[in-house]
């Protein structure tokens, strides 16, 4: 049995890669929460759909997340957490490409958001599942707690911030906000892999 270490907040942050993964979590949850809260409004304002149809199509983003998490539960053991995260990022990027095509039919946007949702689905559980391997089983309990805290920060405040920004710039910036958070996540993911590799080589 592994005895969890009772580390302070500062001690957890000193573990190589922990700060990076926390900001990754915040970035991912920011993307997911913006999609969950604002996709329906995007359909109304940008694609001209009525509220009922927009709400129906908006729910497909969340269904995409749920479906892909169900599927990932069966294939994660075969592919591994790292490949699942990379696959998720690729799917999100493909979805964004569909969303930024100018003057496109709203059906293409629906497909784009579904693909983004499917890409987002496996990322959250994959990061959590990889925590013991990345930072040690004895540290994982405390670090996962921090991950949840940063996840809630992103989920709570980013949709509010997006609402303020979109009121000034227009809600059509939503796909570009997706891209913004995806780029942050990708860059941090690359640095995290280098940091973890260096840490393991030292050990």
Can you say where each PLM-predicted feature lies in the sequence?
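Helix-to-loop junctions at the C-terminal end of transmembrane segments
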Residues: 69-80, 166
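Extracytoplasmic gate region of multi-pass secondary transporters
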Residues: 16-59, 63-66
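Multi-pass alpha-helical transporter architecture, strongest
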Residues: 179-203
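Structural signature of the two symmetry-related core transmembrane helices
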Residues: 83-97
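Paired small-residue
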Residues: 95, 107-115
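Juxtamembrane intracellular "pre-TM" segments in multi-pass secondary transporters
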Residues: 1-21
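Intracellular juxtamembrane helix-capping segments at the cytosolic ends
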Residues: 122-135
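A late C-terminal transmembrane helix in Major Facilitator Superfamily
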Residues: 132-171
């Amino acid at each position: 049995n592994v005895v969890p270490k009772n580390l302070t907040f500062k001690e957890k942050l000193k573990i190589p890669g922990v700060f990076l993964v926390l900001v990754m979590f915040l970035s991912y949850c920011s993307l997911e929460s913006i999609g969950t809260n604002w996709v329906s409004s995007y359909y109304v304002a940008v694609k001209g759909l009525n509220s009922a149809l927009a709400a129906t199509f908006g729910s497909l983003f969340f269904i995409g997340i749920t479906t892909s998490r169900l599927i990932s539960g069966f294939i994660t053991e075969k592919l591994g957490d790292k490949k699942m995260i990379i696959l998720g990022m690729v799917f999100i990027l493909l979805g964004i490409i569909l969303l930024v095509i100018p003057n496109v039919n709203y059906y293409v946007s629906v497909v784009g958001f579904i693909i983004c949702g499917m890409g987002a689905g496996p990322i959250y559980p994959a990061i959590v599942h990889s925590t013991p391997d990345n930072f040690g089983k004895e540290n994982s309990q405390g670090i996962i707690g921090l991950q949840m805290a940063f996840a809630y920060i992103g989920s709570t405040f980013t949709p509010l911030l997006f609402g303020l920004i979109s009121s000034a710039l227009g809600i059509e910036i939503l796909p570009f906000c997706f891209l913004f958070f995806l780029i942050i996540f990708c860059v941090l993911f690359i640095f995290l892999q280098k940091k973890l590799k260096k840490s393991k080589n030292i050990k």
